[in-house]
Amino acid sequence: MVHSISILGSTGSIGRQTVAVADHLGLNVRALTTNRNIQLAEEQARRLHPAFVAVTDEASAKALRIALADTDIAVGGGENALCEAAVISDTDAVVTAVSGAVGLRPTLAAIEKGRRIALANKETLVCAGDIVMRRAREYGAEIVPVDSEHSAIFQCLTGRTGELHKILLTGSGGPFRGWTREATRDVTPEMAVSHPNWSMGAKISVDSATMMNKGLEFIEAMHLFGVTPDDIQVLIHPESVVHSMVELLDGTVIAQLGVPDMGLPIQYALTYPERKPSRSDRLDLTAYPNGLHFYAPDLEALPCLALAMRCARTGGTAPTVMNAANEIAVGLFLGHKIGYHSIYESVAAAVEAIAPVAAPDLDVIRAADQEARAFVRSYFRF
C-alpha cells in the first residue's frame, strides 16, 4: 500500500471521502487542491498539515494564503498549481478527484513522475485515454481506478490477463429509472441531484440521472482494460450491490459485491495489492429478500447513454467534444438556465456539428474541448 498521497479535489464529494480514508489508514497527505471552497480547504489543511494547497480560483487562493499565514503551508493559485500539487515530492500516489477535463494536465504530470494514480476523474480517460494509458506504460505509473464499477472490474480481473471475454458494466439507473423520456421533461436540478443509492456531487449526480455518467464509464472502461465497445455490456442494476462483473473466456462470470460506499474503492486504490479493514458497513445479502435485479437499459429513454456509446465507437475527438459539451450543459442546468432535456439536445448538437479528428494529440484535444464549450454557450446564447 501507499503511505503518502496528494488529493486533487479534496473539497469535493470523492475528495472528502478520500480525506476520511486517509485518516483511517494513517496516510501522510502531502498536498490538497480545491477550486474555491477555501473554508473547507483551510479546515482540511489545519487538520492534515500538507506541505502545499492549490486553489484554482486565483482570488480564492489569495484569501486562503492570508488565512494560513500563521502556518508553514504553501498556497498556490491557478491551474498550474494543480500540477504542482500532483508532482510534489515524497508522494506515493495522487488521487485525482477533481471534476471535469481540468484533471488531464495534473494526471499526466503525476504519471510522468511515475506516481500511482488513484483515478476518480473519468474525464481524463474520456478525453485522452490513448495518450494517458500510453504515458502510464512509458513511465511505469500504475493507474488504479476509484470509480466503483472500474474498481470492481479491476478486482475481478486481477491475475486474469488475457482471459477476459466481456465486461458487464452495472448502473443503478439513477433517480428516474423506469421513467419514459417524456416523463423527464420537467425534471428540476433538485430532482436530478437526489440519487437513490449513492452520495455524490451535483455534477455527477446529474450525469447519473441522464446516464451520461454510465456512458463516460463505458469509454473509461475501454481505455483502462484495453477493450472495444463490443466487449462491454451495460446492465441496469437498481440495488447497486453488484458493482460490475466480468465474463471470462470459458463462460465463468465473476462479480464484485459490496455496499454502495465510495470509501471502499477509494481505500482499495490506496492499499492495493493489500487489503485493510475499512470503516464501511458490511454487505448483508439477506437484506434483499426480493433478490438482485439486472436488465438492459432503454436507450430511447436514455439518449445520453446512447450518444456516449456512439461516440465511443467513433473515437478520436468525439468523446472529448461530448464530454466538454456536457460539462457546460450540466452547469447551465444546475444554474436553472436550461431545461433537463436541453442537456442531451445541446450535447448531441455539438457532437453533430464538430467533426471528429482521429488520433489527436493533446493540442488537438484541447482545441476540440474549447470548441465544444463555446458551441454550447452559443447554442443557448450565453
Regions found by a protein language model. Give the residues of each.
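Catalytic, metal-anchored helix/loop core of enzyme active sites in primary metabolism
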Residues: 1-382
